[in-house]
Amino acid sequence: MKITRKAHPLLKMINHSFIDLPTPPNISSWWNFGSLLGACLALQILTGLFLAMHYTADTTTAFSSVTHICRDVNYGWLIRYLHANGASMFFICLYLHVARGMYYGSYMFLETWNLGVILLLFVMATAFMGYVLPWGQMSFWGATVITNLLSAIPYIGPTLVEWVWGGFSVDKATLTRFFALHFILPFIITALTMVHLLFLHETGSNNPTGLNSDCDKIPFHPYYSMKDLIGLLLLFFFLLLLVLFFPDILGDPDNYTPANPLNTPPHIKPEWYFLFAYAILRSIPNKLGGVLALLLSILILMIIPFIHLSKQRSMSFRPLSQCLFWTLAANLIILTWIGGQPVEHPYITIGQVASILYFTIILILMPLASLIENKILKW
């Protein structure tokens, strides 16, 4: 008689994806982030669902409803801060997941990689709309500034902005539609994640060497299910540390002031995980140029597989590329810092240099380093 997990139509799919899945024996902890992202997504949907039960998407009561959740709902403060800081953990895992893909050449799985970039864009859109919902000062002005960027699109720009707003400014219609979209998008992300996994399991996982490991595989369970569990425990430890001791450390104090269209905050800035892109946007004086640079800062990930000129897939044995990779990582940290600073000297210059460097490293220096490394291989 066949084992149930191998015979049952539904369990069979789960079995092939998470239990008997042939996995390379040498994948490191950098491969944990996929499962951590799944856990973050589940947490966000669950906490978001409970928040939505008490939240009201109306400009007059939105701010009060969030206060009500924190003060009057049983463990409402915990749910709210798990959701807010869970988003930060989500983005930390996302960026590390993408960095792992860049370092070990996982972008050579084209379908998986491109769908991953689309997922990143969806998650960013969802997080942006979620930031608008508490209807504090930074929510309102952040929404105004970012949606206004659409007006840079030639000819249809101004009409498009009013269409997104549902009026002539960010108001009740905007808040209502953002809430509706913020609620539905995570479910679309879940569906896309399943397709992302489907594509990955067509080719099998990459590994730190970048070599084909078809001849040497081990089952996912119990080896990697246990390994993922340790990663999960660490993630929740840091998340709870954040939620229970420093719940507001990553937030903006301005968001504890109700939205006021007549009073502009001195420094309008998005959440910390968008600051690098915001810095790139601000570093270009031209509005349309800034918007294009902002889009390209993420979409550049889709170009990476086509400018991979190295004979080796992974960076494990490529010291020049490794130096450039870590320079890029440091550059992104600088951009994140600059995005949170006021627009004045010397921050403007630092932001412009860091933005130029960001694109130069990816588009010019990395392919160049690959060619030099190819030459060295022949010596």
Curated annotation (Swiss-Prot):
A ubiquinone binds at residue 201. The keyword Iron applies. The chain crosses the membrane at residues 33-53, 77-98, 113-133, 178-198, 226-246, 288-308, 320-340, 347-367. Belongs to the cytochrome b family. The gene is MT-CYB. It comes from Thryonomys swinderianus (Greater cane rat). Binds 2 heme b groups non-covalently. Keywords: Electron transport, Heme, Iron, Membrane, Metal-binding, Mitochondrion, Mitochondrion inner membrane, Respiratory chain, Transmembrane, Transmembrane helix, Transport, Ubiquinone. Heme b b566 binds at residues 97, 196. It comes from the Eukaryota. This is Cytochrome b. Its cofactor is heme b. Signal peptide: none annotated.
